[in-house]
């Protein structure tokens, strides 16, 4: 009998910090399951979840202001360890009888905290340096304006800085801990060890959450959910749908039918690569639909980016629906929904007024399809999906290649999309990526691609002049894709790529390089 991989679990209450998802990812990396819920969760919901421990996240608000978020009182009466981070520490202190004040000295960025003694379970045996008095020093990342000025009864101060007298506090008898810094960010060098101390040593969680156990659990769940029915999946060749295909195939074999739609907006040879990998190599049952003409006809004359996206989404649903109707026994639709999609959608347990979007991985299936949903990646972050993919035997290069937009080249051909433009762009993009790999630059940038500009520019070829199209190259470096810097690729490299594109691809007279950051520009041009 295999162990329940959700048996030991951490509940993270979200107070609005930009780092909250990072806390969850760090806990998962330790090997323990966790979920992210809104701060105003009910006692009944906490009891039902039955956490081994609770983490209170940071947040942008001030504990000193009326109406600011508070942890449910039950959190401190549930009989499980509690770890407050930044705002989480402040609300813990205030709710348990301590004092929090707004400070004129805002701490933001790197700081060094002094650990006061080594007897507490959270910070024991952790150090980055030693102070002259023999106390451990930790390099941490601060981001706060308020600070705790008096800790609750039964608590002790376990760390301090020159400007923050209570940088960390602990009540060992109840296993309550608070830190004013952010252990989840890499700038806090020993942060992972602090979280590991809390999750494993203090909460007593076993490390049951691994790629191998996630696969076993997903396969068992799929088999239980679909029984003897058949399943259909829209396979794009992207990371999420590829991992779903492998999981569902492992669970039910040939009762999975994958539909791969070649919409004419894919990268060079992508359709052939998908069919070869999943059909020939892994033996999945795949239907390839040649739909280039249908998509390009629908896009003809349209040059507005959002309208193009909607057309591409609508036509995909129509094509997929046509194929699904042919599969009379398909009762289930598999989708590559992942945990961040769930967090962002109204269906999420963190669903509040600030919901960002309603997510449907395939653009929303028609209601008349009346299929049940199979979403085996629903609990996983993107980095976990990739690790599961590696465990399933998918190639590293495929799992870790740069992001590609859902509408494909439809939003990298500016303005109206035509077959001629797509063919030119496909080849230019392939040259750029090939040269990045050859120069060992591909993994040094977060995303790189070519863009087709629908403007003609004069050029010289031999003794004659030519009047052809312009290609823009884009490469960025980013951690979270929310902000990005343009990549400072070597001039010699860019010159070589430009020469290859102009000399090898008919119809291009000029290559330019995009040196815009995000903000103000977005990463994609449309």
Curated annotation (Swiss-Prot):
Pathway annotation from the record: Purine metabolism; GMP biosynthesis; GMP from XMP (L-Gln route): step 1/1
Its Enzyme Commission number?
A: 6.3.5.2
Q: Where does the record place the GMPS ATP-PPase domain?
A: 209-401
Name the top EC class. Answer: ligase
Q: Name one GO cellular component term.
A: cytosol
Family annotation (SUPFAM superfamilies):
Adenine nucleotide alpha hydrolases-like, Class I glutamine amidotransferase-like, GMP synthetase C-terminal dimerisation domain
- The keyword Nucleotide-binding belongs to this UniProt entry's keyword annotation: yes
Binding sites annotated in the UniProt record for ATP: 236-242
Pfam families in UniProt? GATase (PF00117), GMP_synt_C (PF00958), NAD_synthase (PF02540)
Under InterPro entries, the record lists: Class_I_gatase-like, GATASE, GMP_synth_C, GMP_synth_GATase, GMP_synthase, GMPS_ATP_PPase_dom, NAD/GMP_synthase, Rossmann-like_a/b/a_fold
Oxidoreductase is among the record's keywords: no
Molecular function GO labels? ATP binding; GMP synthase activity
Boundaries of every Glutamine amidotransferase type-1 domain copy: 9-208
UniProt-annotated catalytic positions? 86, 182, 184
Superkingdom assignment: Bacteria
What this protein catalyses is:
XMP + L-glutamine + ATP + H2O = GMP + L-glutamate + AMP + diphosphate + 2 H(+)
The UniProt entry, under PANTHER family, shows: GMP SYNTHASE [GLUTAMINE-HYDROLYZING] (PTHR11922:SF2), GMP SYNTHASE-RELATED (PTHR11922)
State the protein's purpose.
Catalyzes the synthesis of GMP from XMP.
Entry-linked NCBIfam families:
guaA_Cterm, guaA_Nterm, PRK00074.1
| HAMAP family in the record | GMP_synthase
Q: How does it assemble?
A: Homodimer.
The protein here is known as GMP synthase [glutamine-hydrolyzing]
Q: Which organism is it from?
A: Aeromonas salmonicida (strain A449)
């Amino acid at each position: 009998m295999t162990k329940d991989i959700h048996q030991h679990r951490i509940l993270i209450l979200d107070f609005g910090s930009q780092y909250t998802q990072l806390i969850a990812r760090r806990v998962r990396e330790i090997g323990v399951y966790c979920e992210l819920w809104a701060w105003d969760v009910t006692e009944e919901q906490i009891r039902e979840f039955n956490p081994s421990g609770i983490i209170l996240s940071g947040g942008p608000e001030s504990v000193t202001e009326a109406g600011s978020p508070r942890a449910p009182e039950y959190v401190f009466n549930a009989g499980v360890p509690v770890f407050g981070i930044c705002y989480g520490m402040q609300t813990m202190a205030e709710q348990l009888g301590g004092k929090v004040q707004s400070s004129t000295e805002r701490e933001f960025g790197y700081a060094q905290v002094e650990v006061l003694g080594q007897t507490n379970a959270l910070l024991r045996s952790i150090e980055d340096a030693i102070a002259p008095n023999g106390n451990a020093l930790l390099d941490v990342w601060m981001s706060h304006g308020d600070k705790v000025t008096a800790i609750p009864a039964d608590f002790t101060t376990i760390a301090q800085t020159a400007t923050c007298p209570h940088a960390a506090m602990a009540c060992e008898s109840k296993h309550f801990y608070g830190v004013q810094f952010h252990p989840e960010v890499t700038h806090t060098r020993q942060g992972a060890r602090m979280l590991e101390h809390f999750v494993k040593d203090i909460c007593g969680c076993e490390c049951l959450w691994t790629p191998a156990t996630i696969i076993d659990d997903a396969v068992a769940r799929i088999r239980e959910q679909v029984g003897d029915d058949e399943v259909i999946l829209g396979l794009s060749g992207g990371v999420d749908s590829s991992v779903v295909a492998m999981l569902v195939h492992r669970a039910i074999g040939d009762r999975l039918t994958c539909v791969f739609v070649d919409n004419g907006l894919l990268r060079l040879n992508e359709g052939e690569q998908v069919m070869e990998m999943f059909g020939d190599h892994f033996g999945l049952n795949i239907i390839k639909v040649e739909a280039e003409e249908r998509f390009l006809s629908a896009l003809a004359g349209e040059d507005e980016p959002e309208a193009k996206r909607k057309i591409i989404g609508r036509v995909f649903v129509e094509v997929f629906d046509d194929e699904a109707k042919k599969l009379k026994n398909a009762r289930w639709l598999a989708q590559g929904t992942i945990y961040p999609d769930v967090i962002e959608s109204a269906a999420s347990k963190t669903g509040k007024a600030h919901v960002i979007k309603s997510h449907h991985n395939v653009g929303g299936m028609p209601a008349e399809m009346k299929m049940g949903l199979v979403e085996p990646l629903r609990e996983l972050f993107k980095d976990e999906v990739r690790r599961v993919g590696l465990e399933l035997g998918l190639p590293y290069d495929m799992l870790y290649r740069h992001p590609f937009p859902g509408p494909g080249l439809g939003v990298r051909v500016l303005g109206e999309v035509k077959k001629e433009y797509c063919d030119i762009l496909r080849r230019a993009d392939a040259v750029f990526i090939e040269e990045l790999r050859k120069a060992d630059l591909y993994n040094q940038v977060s995303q790189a691609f070519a863009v087709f500009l629908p403007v003609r520019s004069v050029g010289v070829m031999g003794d004659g002049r030519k009047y052809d199209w312009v290609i823009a190259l884009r490469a960025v470096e980013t951690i979270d894709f929310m902000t990005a810097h343009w990549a400072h690729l070597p001039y010699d490299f860019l010159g070589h790529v430009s020469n290859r594109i102009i000399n090898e691809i008919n119809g291009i007279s000029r290559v330019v390089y995009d040196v815009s950051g995000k903000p103000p520009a977005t990463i994609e041009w449309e």
